[in-house]
């Protein structure tokens, strides 16, 4: 097995070289995810597999709507996710499109699944959401997408062990390069 680090936008891939190509948490950050999927699919040998995984934030919600932090968490997420989508920074709802990207890339034997995880405030997983929000906060603030108090409230919720939430769906989609040809 050879594991490689690769920049899908600038580094060439050898056509038909790999039995398996996998990417995770990448495509939602790209302006043209289909082109990236096609590039990766072209690197898979006939009979090999492409597996792509990314988030869909449709499920992001407080697990207990009666928790004192739930309403602010929900309201702020409801403002930020459409803002990030409209700004082109990332596509927070890309996960639901992964199966169609695999099909559009010409792969066969396609499949998909989605898993939502329950996160507890103060956990490492909740910290990941907090840090991601922290990195994106300056842009949200400068464009008026959210106030500092709202961002602070979400940050406090993700650090509060009494608060829990459903995180983004982790969507996986896969397909096989046909043995009689290549992916598109």
Predicted feature residues:
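A short SAM/SAH-binding and catalytic strip from SAM-dependent methyltransferases
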Residues: 19-34
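Core SAM-dependent methyltransferase catalytic element
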Residues: 105-108, 168-184
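Conserved catalytic/acceptor-binding region of the Class I
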Residues: 51-123
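C-terminal helical/coil "lid" or tail adjacent to the Rossmann-like core of SAM-dependent
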Residues: 110-165
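A short glycine-rich, Lys/Arg-flanked "PGG" loop and its adjoining helix->strand segment in the class I
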Residues: 34-49
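Conserved SAM-binding strand-loop segment of SAM-dependent methyltransferases
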Residues: 1-10
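Conserved Rossmann-like nucleotide-binding pocket used by diverse enzymes
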Residues: 4, 22, 51
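A short acidic, Gly/Pro-enriched loop at the edge of an enzyme's catalytic core
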Residues: 9-21
